[in-house]
Every structure is written in structure tokens, then in C-alpha cells.
Amino acid sequence: MYRALYAFRSAEPNAMAFAAGETFLVLERSSTHWWLAARARSGETGYVPPAYLHRLQGMEQDVLQAIDRAIEAVHNTAMRDGGKYSLEQRGVLQKLIHHRKETLSRRGTSASSATVMTPSTSDHHLDAAVSRQPNGVCRTGFERQHSLPSSEHLGTDGALYQVPPQPRRAAPTTPPPPVKRRDREALVISGSGGRTAIPSGGSSVSSGSSASSTSMDTLYTGSSPSELGPSCSPTPPPVPRRGAHTTVSQPQPSPSKAPSPEPPTEEVAAETNSTPDDLEAQDALSPETTEEKAAAETVVPRTIGAELMELVRRNTGLSHELCRVAIGVVVGHIQATVPASSPIMEQVLLSLVEGKDLSTALPSGQVCHDQQRLEVIFADLARRKDDAQQRSWALYEDEDVIRCYLEELLHILTDADPEVCKKMCKRSDFESVLALVAYYQMEHRASLRLLLLKCFGAMCSLDAAIISTLVSSVLPVELARDMQTDTQDHQKLCYSALVLAMVFSMGEAVPYAHYEHLGTPFAQFLLSIVEDGLPMDTTEQLPDLCMNLLLALNLHLTAPEQNVIMAALSRHTNVKIFSEKLLLLLNRGDDPVRIFRHEPQPPHSVLKFLQDVFSSSATAAIFYHTDMMALIDITVRQIADLSPGDKLRMEYLSLMHAVVRSTPYLQHRHRLSDLQATLRRILTEEEASPQCQMDRMIVQEMYKEFPDLGEVPS
């Protein structure tokens, strides 16, 4: 990386004008007096005089950024020309990519050895990068076009780019220098022993003796008064010209043996007489100040993740989780593809992970769009509920408007940030949720009721507190009444059973007044649907939904002797299909009622139901003999297979205890030896966890009540 000490402007073709302080990336040292360079700021390429440049150390990251900008400039120019690359553009790309590889390798070597590369070493690598070009020769023509075409040039190696295929062609050993004006002897070397004049007419250095790049950086002094920069010497060197005759310079000793020339007296005087403004300008160009400015500019606000989520969701309609995935994929790809942006992209990813709640993660003053829409929808639906005309014929004129509101509400509850939805539902002691329940009770149009049921189901998935509110509301009573009175609408009947199972899925206590509609008659109605079905139920979904509803409804009934479902079960003459479905669920180990992951988790609904069934001999008789044997097989196997400390093992032990107590198990003794061996193993377990202690207590109680279980088989 080089910085311009002086401003430069020339009428020569292919020469690049620049101001003092600009930084460059040297691509090729074409000759002693002209280097092919790329402007670090824009990626523009052209020939510059090395006498005007000063080498900067320890800026590999800036070099990589400059290379990437130059590559991008070449590709963009080619895209504007129809996607075709000229030979000159291919040559520039080749040099840029090779230089990038060398820079990455040098940075890796420097990091591993923890040493700083000296200027001579850096120059050696730069020269080696030039000498190891794939075509082995320097390209001719002015390589001014630049920048990056998208993915076709992304590679898998460290360079990340791949040069498009190009035909080989012969090239002169020296690049085309600026056109000759006149010969001049202009460059003066100020050494410790005196002055030596060197012809500047584009003389080429012989292969046997070339000046080192270290001495080249300090070789020329002076500046033109008309183009003098604030931190530059008053007299820059004259512009190098290519003369009509090429002059071979005299052999010079190698850089390691020759002493470095002293700085010219003019430059020393200029540095001594520098004004405070000049010193401030020099400080502004220092690498340390540049790095500090860059660090200050790359501070990523902590709200960037939430802002991106809001923008993507609002403009694409993707769900909250898909928005997070999309942003993470894009930011991660940028981080991997553009290494210079890695620190910034990492902060963006962290902000994306930390910003869980959009309503609080957004900058102060900004409100989440979904939150705004929920406020509008809840307020308008509440207004329509309280409308004095809602019981008149005019109510039916607003069906389309209400349907649009409910569809948008369902979309937001399903796809928006769950934290935002929970916040809006819990506002003012669940006022909005209770208003929707009251509106459902008043609304008789089937299409709107169906949308309301879907919204209630989406609300149940948000938080357990919303389920508690719905259990205590009039919704369960209204759903039970609606299911028994309107059995013709199959779709609404299915959704009513599903939502009611969701409401009862947490096993919370139901208000006593609800049993007027949720008592034994309702349980018998559900059992009849499971056993006999309904004529319009061609998909056979309704029996399974009613089965799940019975299991969920049984969760909050703690006393078996007062269990309305067990009472209905004992009165039902035939529950063959119900018992088979129950046995199938037990064999699978599934709990169809555990729909959500809310805490605290309720008991296993299938095991709880079977324990209540075998709490009485009247209900235990619903199983046929073969089904009973299969149930014992499953229970004994689960007790033997489950690990110590597993809560389910205690549930299966309690079930087996109830089976032995309420059925003639000791008469047929099915799988008795396996059961005895498992019970003995449980008693000898040394685990001290509360679950293991409870398991041992159940086994001891079984031995005490049924001594035959403790007998050692002969």
C-alpha cells in the first residue's frame, strides 16, 4: 500500500492523476519510472510515477479492501459492456487476484510468526507476485477498466475470485509507458558523498542491476508549487518522461550492501519549516488516525437486528422466523465472502440473536408494524361488538370487513413475533381476548365463527396465561353448547373440538358453573361420536378429535369417584372403538393432548385416563380379554425399559398397581415372572432421586397389598 506525497497531473495518455494523500495499490512495477497502480478509494487503475509515492506498513486489511474494490470495478465495467471482458481487463483481473493471494498468504505468515515484515521483504514478495503471473509476461495496453461480476468469479480458494477464461497472446516485456514529449535530465539523487545526475527519459534498468524498492521510496524529492499538498515538500520532482532513446543506468550495488541515501536538503528544510496546519494534515493521513476513524465508523447500533427484521417482514410478508433465517443467511454469506466486513456482520448477527422482542428492541420512537395493526384490529372488533346495531339486519353488511380483520389477525398471530402478540393479548388483563370471546358468543355467522376459532387456537399457542384466561371465560361453555346443537357443519364441529381440547390441554381447574354444559351428557355425546361417528364425517377426523377432547377434559378431573367422564364410560354399553384407540395410543407412547410446550407440563393424558379407568372395576371391564393382555404387555415392557428417575416409570407403576387391584390379574398372572423381576430390580436400585424413591414406595405398597407379587418363583 502506497500513499501519494504530492499531487500529480499529467497530459500523458494512460497516466493517472491524483491528489496528495491518496492511497494506491501497486499492481505491477512496469519500469523504473512508471508503476501500474489501483486507486484504493475507487479501484481505478492507471500508471503513476513511483517518485510521488511513499510506502505504508502494516495495512494488509486496507490492501485487501483496495484489491476487492478494484476487482469489483473491473467486473462492473464489463457488465456495462454486455458482460464481455477485454484482454486488458483480463490482465488486470489476473494481477489483482494474484496480488490478493500473495497478500493473504503474507498476512497468514505474519500472524503465525508474530513478526513484522520489513519493507525489503514486502517488496520481495510483491516482485515475486509480479514475476509469478500465470502467463509469465506483462500485459500490454492500458488497464483502466475494472470491478467485480457477481458469482461467476467467486472461488473456493483463499483468493475468493476466479479469472474468467482468456486466450493467450504475446505481449512485450515492458508495458506501454506514457507517450514521449521531450528528453529531460530531471532526477537528482542526494547521497552522502555528493549528487549524481540520472537521466529520466524513461530509462530501463538492466536485468543484472536494479534499484531496490526501499531506496526507490526515498529516491525522489521536491514538489511543484502549483500542486503542493499541505503535508508535502515545496518542490516535487519533475514528471518522468520516456525519451526517444533508452539509456541504460549504471550498475548499482545491491540494497543490502549500499548505504541508504540521505534525504535531500530541500526536503529536510521543508519538513523543518512545516506549519502547524501541515502537521495536522500529516496526522490526518497517518495510519493510526485512519484506523481510529474506521473503527468509529463501523460501530453497529444494537437495534440493527430488530430494524432488519421489521423491514424484511413488512416488505416481504415472511413469518418472523423465516425473516430471521433469511437475514442470517444473507449476513452470513456477506461475512464469508467479504472478509473485511466480518466484524460488522458479526455484530449484526449478534444483534439479530439478541433482539427477541421487536416491540422493545426497535429504536426509541419506533413501533412494530404488527403491534400497530393488532391495536387497530382489536379496537375495531371491540367497537363492533359494542355497536348497538349489531343485533339488527344491518349487521350482515359488515361481514366482508370483519372477515378481512379476522384473516389479518390470524395471519399476525401465526407469523408475527410471538412476544409482540403475547404483549398485545395480555394488555389490560386480557381485555382484547375476552372481547373476542364475547364477540364469538354474539356472532352467529358460521364463516366468522370459524375464523374466530382459528384465532383462539393461535392465541393458545402463544402463552399458558392466555389458555388460563380462556378456561375461565364463557368460551368452553359456548363451544360445548354449539357442538351439541349444531352437528351439521362438519368443519366448525372439528374446529370446535380442536380448540376446546387446546383450552383443556393444560389440566387447569374448570369453574364449577361450567359443569352444567361439560358434565356427563357432554361426555356421552363425545363417546357416541367416537363409537358411531356422524354421517357427514367422510374424512373420519371427528372421532379422533373427540377422543383427544375426552383425554384433555379428563386432565382437570382429579377425583375418580366424581369423574363425569368415568360415569359416562360406565353407562355406555359399547366402547370397543374407544378402548382400541386408547390402547393404540398407549402402545405408541403418544400424548395427543400435549400440543404446546407451555410450563408447567400436565400429566400424560393417556396414562392419567387409564389410571382413572382402572380405579374402579366398573370401568375396568370396558376392555376385552385380548386387549387386556396387550395392555399388560405394554405396561410391563415400559416399566422394565424406562430408566431410573424417569417420571413416566412412576406413572406406569401406578397404572400396573391399579390393574392388579381392579382386575383378576392374580388369576391369569400374565407376564407375572417378568413383572416380579422388574419390581425386585427397582427395589435394589441405589439412586436417591425423588422419582426413584417414589418408585420404591409404589413397589413396596404393591408387595404389601398383594404378597403374591413378592414371591420368588420356584
Curated annotation (Swiss-Prot):
Residues 252-263 have a biased composition (Pro residues). A motif (Nuclear localization signal) lies at residues 168-185. GO terms for biological process: positive regulation of neuron projection development; regulation of postsynapse assembly. PROSITE patterns: SH3 (PS50002). One of its GO terms (cellular component) is COP9 signalosome. Residues 1-58 form the SH3 domain. Keywords: Nucleus, Phosphoprotein, SH3 domain, SH3-binding. SMART domains: SH3 (SM00326). Residues 200-215 have a biased composition (Low complexity). The modification Phosphoserine is found at S120, S260, S286, S673. Residues 103-126, 139-298 are annotated as: Disordered. Residues 106-121, 216-226 have a biased composition (Polar residues). The modification Phosphothreonine is found at T174. GO terms for molecular function: SH3 domain binding. PANTHER family: NCK-INTERACTING PROTEIN WITH SH3 DOMAIN, SH3 ADAPTER PROTEIN SPIN90 NCK INTERACTING PROTEIN WITH SH3 DOMAIN. Has an important role in stress fiber formation induced by active diaphanous protein homolog 1 (DRF1). Induces microspike formation, in vivo. In vitro, stimulates N-WASP-induced ARP2/3 complex activation in the absence of CDC42. May play an important role in the maintenance of sarcomere and/or in the assembly of myofibrils into sarcomeres. Implicated in regulation of actin polymerization and cell adhesion. This is NCK-interacting protein with SH3 domain. It comes from Mus musculus. The lineage of its organism: Eukaryota, Metazoa, Chordata, Craniata, Vertebrata.
